[in-house]
Structure formats: C-alpha cells, structure tokens
Regions:
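Low-complexity, glycine/alanine/valine/leucine- and proline-rich hydrophobic stretches
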Residues: 636-668, 672
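Active-site-adjacent "subsite" loops/lids of carbohydrate-active enzymes
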Residues: 217-218, 384-432
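Hydrophobic faces of well-ordered beta-strands that scaffold small-molecule active sites
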Residues: 150-154, 188-190, 372-376, 448, ...
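Active-site-proximal loop/turn and secondary-structure-junction residues that shape catalytic pockets
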Residues: 158, 194, 378-384, 454-456, ...
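Conserved alpha/beta catalytic core and glycan-binding cleft of carbohydrate-active enzymes
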Residues: 271, 280-283, 500-639
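Acidic/aromatic-lined carbohydrate-recognition and catalytic surfaces
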Residues: 42-76, 80, 86, 94-105, ...
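Active-site-proximal helices and loops of the catalytic beta/alpha 8
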Residues: 362-363, 381, 385-408, 462-568
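Short, well-ordered coil/turn segments that N-cap beta-strands
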Residues: 148-150, 184-186, 368-372, 444-446, ...
Length: 691
C-alpha cells in the first residue's frame, strides 16, 4: 500500500497530514497514526482495497445524499446554489416572521443577497432546506458594554453562602453578581455548568461533562425557586441537617458526599412538588414541553445510566449497554421510560431548577448594573459515554478523544478524554447538535467563553486510550460553524470570547477578530525569556486577564508556590528545584520591571506578593483590551490555583472554596482597594485613549 493513497484518503477525511507545532517546527503525522485515526472514523486503510472502499464512503458522505438540510451565508452576500440547482430555478423564501419572498436564481444559480440575519426556509423544485444568514460579526463588547468594560471570573462551585450544603449554587451566584456589580464590574465569567453524571459522582471536572446541552443540577438552589419553607421541610424529612452543615464547613469540596446529599434532597423536593397544588407546576410543565426531545433524552439517559450498572456496581459506557438500549429512539428505551416515568420527571425537575436559577442570576446581574452579566463557559467537548453522545450519535465521534499535541505547557501532549463533533454528522443533520448547544449556553448569559476556540476549525483527536502524541488534527466546517456562532450570538445579543492559547494556526486569530470574537491574552504568558510586553503592546482584539484556572494565581506564581506543588505531585523532580527557581526569579524580575510604573514603588526593589498583585491588576487596566477579566482568586490575593492539568489524585482540582460569603466576598479592605484602583484606572485609561 502506498503512502500516497493513504495521504489522499486522510486528506479527503479532513485530517491534516502536516502541521506546525508550538515551537514553530513543521511536523508530519506518521502513516500508522493516520491508519489508527481513520479506523476510528470508520474508514479502513490497511490495504489499497480498503482505501478505495473508504474513499467511496467519503464520497457518499460528502454528497449529503443530495441537497443538505442547512446552508450558511453572510448577510448582504449572494448564496451559490449551483452544486444543487440549475440557474433560473424558481424559489420561495420564508422568513422566521412568516414573510415570503419569491423569485428566481440568477444565471450563476445564486440566491439573491439577504440583508436581515436569521433562519430562512428555502423551497426550490420541491426541495426544502434551511438557510442561515449570519451577521458579519458577533456583537462587540463596545456595542454591548461600552469602552471601559471589565469583569471578574469565578468558579461557581467555590462560591459560599449560609446554608449552601458544601457547594456553590445559583443562589450564591445571585449574591456574587450583586457584590461584583457594586464594585463596578460589568461581567462575571463562571466555570462551566454543564450536566454531569448523577450515577458517576466521582467525575466532577466541569470540563468533562455528560452533556453540554443541559446543566449540573448539583448547583441548583431549590430554596430560591420553591421557597425556603419547602426546602427546610425536605431537609428535615431526609434527616440531612447535620450532614449539610458538616459539608458546608469543609475547606475542600467533598464532591461524592455533596452529590449524595443533594440528590436525596432534590428527590424529596420533587416528591413533595409532585403531590400537586404547587402554582409552579405550570411553569415546570412548560419548561419540560419546550425542552422537547433533547431534554427527554437526557433525562432518560440519567435513569438508564443509574439502572444499568455492572455486577460490581460501576456505571458503564452506553456502548456497553444491552443493544436495545443503545439507541435512544428504540422501542425498548420508550418502554423503559414509561416504566420509570417518575424518575425521568425527577431529572427534568432538576434541570428546571437550574435553568430558573441561572435565569435569576442573570436578571440580578443586569438589575445590579452589569452591562454584560454572566459569561458562560463552553467546554471543548463532552464525555463519549455521556448523554449528549448517546442522544446525538450521528453527530459526535465517541471513538476518538479530543486533546492537544505537545506544546510549551505540556511537552507530552494532552488527552482530555472527551469526544468531538463529527464534521459529516453535523453537516448531514443541519448542524442541529451544534446550534442547540450554542443556544443552551447562551440562554441565561450576556456572553460566552469558548474553551479551546481552535476547535471551531480543527481538533487534535486521539484514539480512545492512546498516547496523546499519536494524534492528528481533524478539520471542521469552520466557515459554517463561525457563521452560526455569529448568528446565535446576534440573536442573544451576547459577546463571544475565544480561548486561543496553545498551538494556533497562522491567521486564525485575525479571522476570529474580524468576526468580533475576542481572543485571550494572559499576563503571565505575554513575555519572552523574562521580557514582558507593555500594556500598549496588548492587542485591541483580545481580552486581557492575569491568570486562568489552569495556571497559578498571581500570588502563587510570585511566591513560587506552583513550583512546590509540581515537585510535590511528581511533575518535576526535586533535583530540578533550583533550576526552576532560577528561571522563576528571572521571570519575576522581568515582571517586576514591567509593573514598576503601576506599583508606585522603587523599580530596583522586588515587590511583595500583595503589591505585585495590585500593580498587575492596574497594569491590565491600561491595556487597549476591550474587556479585562480579573479572576476572583487574584482580586482576593489567593495563593492556591484551581486546577493542575494532568493531575487527578494528588492535587485538589476543582475542590477549593472561596474564603467568604459571596454577598460580601469582595468587600475586604485589600480587595476593595484593589478593585477601586483598577476600575478608576480603567476609566481613566480608556477615557484618555478616546480623547
């Protein structure tokens, strides 16, 4: 078998044979890796005959079986339909408001330009399809929030309030947005709130969800929706008072214990609610009806996943279930759902509480004066064994895992254990799964952060369980996905932030910026060999921030606390401690020089950690970034970081809680001073820039 034939198949399948790594070196994927990934895509490539057969499969997939269910186009641009219809074909175009336009395609078989963004129903020669007309750009921060916008980022699970039972919830989030707004913030970015597995309580990373279409019900605050009296009664009935108080006192979240107690409590609340007579029943019924098939399938999955355990009591991947349950549309699944209708309704009840809680938090944010409000966080993928993969099997690739090639931060690469969309599945199904995901994550927010925004164009995919180095980039229908993102952002009047760190293809940042999608610049990364960029060197097409959840806090970095942690967990040998410290001292001296103008201190003297945090936040205020986001950890001067990538057991990832009640979290003298100085500097700098 020739490598030439293999490469032809790989390229036809959307795989990038050649790529540029983080060190700007050209790389080529090994033939063996290509064959492994192609096999996971259902394309055999062991022999020339295999390749010929696989090319025929691709030809059929790419043909979509005729006219595709959805096409995208920019507003003010003609849509080329020559691949599907002859010139001068008669058409009828129906807008979402019911308005109808009739006409003929031009001599090049193009549909005349449409000015108004939206979804249109196009009929030609008895064929019907949807045409998505996208605005040229997402709403910009300047359009939504003005010229001096800034906000904070917080981990939802870390928030505290009296009676929270050991985990941050939407009621604490309401208090947090009010507290942040009181200090002048326009936005609060939060960690992902995607649905997890109710039957797999040890999986709690918010970036490894069961579904990005629904919510983690453990963050629901039922008392805020149903009332405190029903909540107290349910706690008493369950005998959970002492346990909830114990969990609330912990410094680190005990996720399994929290999940057990909250699920018991939610079930009791549902049972009480279901007795009838609750005026909120109408709202719940409406929510469930509007959720449609997607909500029903998620709830059915949760019940099936709980019931279908193996002999050892471990939950199973849905692909290992009895065959009659692997298809969500099967008669067996319908029968199971009818038999367990009460349990299915219970899971819908939890989703209702979460949706209403997030809605309340966004209303509270805007009412308190935030111009953007909540910024949701969209994880790059979902667990291949989860409800989204089960219910959207034609649109997700469950046999491949998303990750990242070796780069500056992770020299061994990364395998995130989550599945990606199928490029062909999306196109063949009218991008249904993608659109519904965008809508779910924009429904209760004024903005959305897209984790690893590179995934709109390409994703590093690895066979499940394989070494992350043995992967390849899989390309996606980028233009279509970008247009749909712009359209949904426009419909929701939301700003879009794209996390563009790591290995980025040349020119991608410019394309995203032209579409109004803000990139991200992190203070600790904006340097070369200890020489940090000045605020003026930051781009005006990206947000600026001090740190992220995957790297040290400013205080922790300044003190070298992260070095101690890396040695403690075995990422770095003890013998490298001195070298690590020397490198850090060089970088710290460079940042100290960069901050001297904003510290008011002698530039020849090393700043204290507290003064460095003050100066760093003031530094960010002077960048031309249209939006600056300050992590709550840095606003408070905390030392510990949220997550250490690649570490599971030896560092408390996703378990840390903030030191005070959300209603007053930012009101300490140090954080109040820090935020007041930052807000004033932001106003002054942006005002000067526009004079």
């Amino acid at each position: 078998m020739s490598d030439e034939a293999l490469i032809r198949l790989a390229e036809a399948a959307g795989l990038s044979i050649d790529w540029i790594d983080a060190d700007n070196r050209e790389q080529r994927v090994e033939p063996a890796v290509l064959r492994e990934v192609l096999a996971c895509l259902g394309l055999a490539a062991e022999t020339d005959a295999d390749i010929d057969a696989s090319l025929e499969i691709l030809a059929h997939k790419n043909n979509h079986g005729g006219v595709p269910p959805l096409l995208t186009c920019d507003q003010h641009a003609a849509l080329d339909l020559s691949a599907y219809f002859p010139a001068a074909s008669r058409f009828e175009l129906q807008a979402e408001d019911g308005g109808v336009q009739q006409g003929t395609l031009d001599y090049q078989a193009r549909l005349p330009a449409i000015d108004a963004p939206g979804y249109y129903r196009l009929t030609i020669d008895k064929h019907q399809l949807t045409v998505a007309i996208a605005p040229l750009s997402c709403p910009t921060v300047a359009q939504i929030a003005g010229a001096d916008a800034w906000g904070l980022t917080a981990q939802l699970y870390s928030l505290r309030r009296a009676g929270d039972g050991g985990l941050g919830d939407t009621q604490a989030l309401e208090s947090m947005v009010s507290n942040a707004a009181a200090h002048g913030a326009d936005a609060l970015g939060i960690s992902p709130v995607h649905a997890m597995f109710s039957a797999h309580i040890n999986q709690y990373s918010p970036y490894s969800p069961s579904s990005r279409l629904f919510f983690n019900v453990l963050h629901a605050a039922p008392g805020a929706i149903l009332g405190e009296r029903p909540l107290r009664q349910a706690i008493e009935t369950c005998g959970l008072g002492e346990e909830l108080e114990r969990l609330e006192r912990l410094d680190l979240i005990d996720w399994p214990a929290v999940a057990q107690s909250r699920q018991r409590l939610l079930r009791q609340l549902f049972d009480d609610f279901s007795k009838g007579g609750n005026p909120l029943q109408v709202d719940f019924d409406s929510f469930r009806a509007n959720g449609g098939e997607a909500l029903e399938n998620h709830c059915r999955f949760e019940v099936l996943h709980t019931h279908l355990r193996n002999a050892q009591g471990h939950t199973q991947h849905w692909s290992d279930w009895p065959s009659e349950y692997r298809d969500p549309a099967s008669p067996a699944v319908d029968a199971f759902a009818r038999e367990h209708a009460d349990e299915v309704s219970y899971h819908a009840f939890g989703q209702w509480l979460m949706a209403r809680g997030l809605e309340r938090a966004q209303v509270a944010a805007r009412s308190a004066g935030m111009r953007i409000g909540l910024i949701s966080d969209l994880a790059v993928g979902a667990d291949g064994g989860g409800s989204q993969a089960w219910s959207r099997q034609a649109e997700l690739l469950a046999s491949l895992s998303v990750g990242a090639p070796p780069d500056i931060m992770n020299r061994d690469g990364q395998n995130w254990g989550i599945s990606a969309f199928s490029p062909w599945g999306l196109q063949q199904n009218g991008f249904r799964a993608y659109i519904e995901m965008l809508r779910a994550n924009l429904a209760h927010a004024g903005g959305m952060r897209i984790d690893h925004v590179l995934g709109l164009k390409r994703l590093w995919v690895v066979p499940a369980g394989a070494d992350p180095k043995r992967g390849v980039y899989l390309n996606f229908p980028f233009d279509d996905m970008l247009r749909l993102l712009c359209l949904e952002a426009w419909r929701h009047q939301a700003v879009i932030l794209g996390e563009d760190l790591g290995t980025i293809p040349h020119g991608l940042r410019d394309v995203l910026a032209a579409r109004g999608i803000l990139g991200m610049r992190v203070l600790l990364f904006e340097q070369h060999d200890g020489h940090f960029q000045t605020p003026a060197q930051y781009p005006a097409q990206a947000l600026a921030t001090s740190t992220t959840h995957d790297i040290p806090t400013l205080t922790g970095w300044w003190r070298g606390h992260d070095i101690d942690w890396r040695i403690k967990v075995g990422q770095v040998p003890e013998s490298d401690r001195d070298a690590q410290w020397r490198a850090r001292e060089k970088e710290r001296a460079g940042l100290n020089r960069a901050l001297c103008e904003y510290s008011g201190k002698n530039p020849d003297v090393l700043l204290s950690a507290e003064d460095a945090v003050d100066a760093a936040i003031c530094f960010l205020a002077h960048t031309p970034a249209p939006l600056v986001l300050v992590p709550v950890e840095d606003a408070l001067g905390l030392e510990e970081q949220t997550n250490m990538p690649g570490i599971v057991e030896t560092h408390p990832n996703w378990r840390r809680r903030y030191p005070g009640d959300s209603a007053t979290l930012l009101d300490s003298p140090a954080s109040s001073r820090r935020l007041a100085s930052f807000a004033q500097a932001r106003r002054n700098h942006r005002g000067a820039a526009h004079r």
